[in-house]
């Protein structure tokens, strides 16, 4: 299992090359150096650069490169695109998708960026405080999910409902999602 968690620990004083050599010693026989350097090259990370001089997003990608080099069967990635700007995030999402398919890897990931999920996942689980709200193939969610926007009168309190997920109100506008079809709500 390869695990990437938010706030991952790295040796800040090392360079990209030094940290790869350090981690490789812990995985004799299974370390895939080429997977690490392929990702570093794809993201244009300079291998002589010290980790302490990298952005948060670059550090995340170094951590992910180290995980890919471990060659795990299962990758667990928590907020894997944290700190990446949209261009690099898109590049990385495409790389991760292609890597998982070509290497036959299973990837369990979390993200708050729905656009990334549409391009990466086959099945989706939507959770709220540890409770599974929905578990379906992504194609079905995209087909059946509905987005609604309502104008809320000033001072009106909304009642709680199990039919709406993650409501948010900004400037008297309620934006919510439902996976019930209009015919099911009548």
Explain the meaning of each model-derived region:
Residues 3-62:
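ABC-family P-loop ATPase nucleotide-binding domains
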Residues 50-52, 80, 137:
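Conserved structural locus in ABC ATPase nucleotide-binding domains
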Residues 71:
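Conserved catalytic motifs of ABC-family nucleotide-binding domains
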Residues 75-79:
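Catalytic Walker B motif of ABC-type/P-loop ATPase nucleotide-binding domains
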Residues 82-84:
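ABC ATPase nucleotide-binding domain "signature" loop
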Residues 86-88:
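Helix N-cap at the start of a conserved alpha-helix in ABC-type nucleotide-binding domains
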Residues 91-179:
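ABC transporter nucleotide-binding domain
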């Amino acid at each position: 299992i390869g695990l990437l968690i938010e706030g991952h620990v790295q040796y800040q004083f090392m360079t990209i090359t030094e940290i790869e050599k350090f981690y490789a010693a812990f995985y004799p026989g299974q370390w895939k150096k080429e997977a690490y350097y392929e990702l570093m090259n794809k993201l244009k990370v300079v291998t002589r650069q010290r980790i302490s001089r990298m952005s948060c997003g670059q550090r995340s990608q170094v951590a992910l490169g180290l995980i890919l080099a471990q060659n795990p069967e299962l990758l667990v990635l928590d907020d894997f695109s944290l700190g990446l700007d949209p261009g690099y995030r898109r590049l990385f999402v495409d790389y991760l998708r292609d890597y998982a398919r070509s290497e036959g890897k299973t990837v369990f990931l979390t993200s708050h960026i729905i656009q990334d999920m549409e391009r990466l996942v086959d099945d989706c689980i939507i959770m709220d405080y540890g409770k599974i709200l929905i578990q379906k193939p992504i194609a079905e969610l995209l087909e059946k999910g509905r987005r609604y926007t309502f104008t809320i009168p000033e001072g009106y309190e909304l009642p709680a409902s199990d039919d709406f997920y993650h409501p948010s109100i900004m400037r008297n506008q309620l934006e919510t999602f439902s996976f019930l079809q209009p015919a099911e709500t009548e």
